[in-house]
Amino acid sequence: MRKQNFVLAVLVLALAQFLALPGRALAADNPFQRGPDPTSASVNATRGPFATSQMTVSRLSVSGFGGGTIYFPTSTAEGTFGAVAVAPGFTATQSSVAWLGPRIASQGFVVFIIDTVTTFDQPDARGTELLAALDYLTTRSSVRARVDSTRLAVMGHSMGGGGTLEASADRPALQAAVALTPWDLTKNWSGNRVPSLIVGAENDTVAPVATHSIPFYNSLDAASEKTYVELAGATHFAPNSPNTTIARYAISWLKEFVDNDDRYEQFLCGAGAGTEATVDDYRTTCPLTN
């Protein structure tokens, strides 16, 4: 009996120590937390902790958008994942932002990078297409069982960034929006309540920050949370190539609001946030509430 009691005591102690490991208490409290505790190196990395795969969705098999490519974690051992639909800019195709697919998916998300119905579609059309893509992803796609349909986000570049704001204004149940050097004729987004990350570029002559990104950010007075990152010395087309600063803030934003993962707030609100040489201007509503 004494031996059994001793063994039981050892097991209880071991379990207590296991639960006390970094991230364990948070994981128990937050069922949406995915992956190990993040570091600055891990959010900057070209690949995260999850192995990924991808599948092509033909435009002939869908309606409301132009098909695309789905990037997703291969393992579901940690459960389902939040998802984000991504739209390219004016005259561009999914290939222009394809680098975001495996980079974000490997951090624990299902990423659907879409083609638009036509490459000339305007922001409002792109917003509608982003929502159609999310609907397809969660109801008809072959990876729908991997997706938590309550944890969805939108992202886009240029007119796709404008489409991101259009989509989040139309569907306030979205968990997050990430607009990359966004362009839109609409300047007032005061009714948009979705937590929004706006990424502008200092030398953008297509969508100058003074008439696009900054007014967009300032008008988001109803958004529960918002952050503005301006890329130092960058042009409108910075999101078309792998960019560590864009990835760092986009991943952290999605983790914070799609996964409710406060472990990533340090990269948005910590002492080093916005102080990188690659950032020219940084504005935020920190501390953040997800």
What is each residue range found by the language model?
Residues 28-79:
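N-terminal cap/lid segment of alpha/beta-hydrolase-fold proteins
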Residues 75-80, 122-162, 263:
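Gly/Ser-rich "nucleophile elbow"/oxyanion-hole loop immediately N-terminal to the catalytic nucleophile
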Residues 79-89:
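Short beta-strand element of the alpha/beta-hydrolase
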Residues 95-115:
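Short amphipathic alpha-helix adjacent to the substrate-entry channel of hydrolases
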Residues 192, 198-200:
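Short beta-strand/loop motif that positions the catalytic acidic residue
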Residues 203-208, 236-237:
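Acidic catalytic loop of the alpha/beta-hydrolase fold
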Residues 207-218:
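Short alpha-helix in the alpha/beta-hydrolase fold that links the catalytic acid
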Residues 232-233, 240-290:
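Alpha/beta-hydrolase-fold serine-hydrolase catalytic core, especially in secreted/extracellular enzymes
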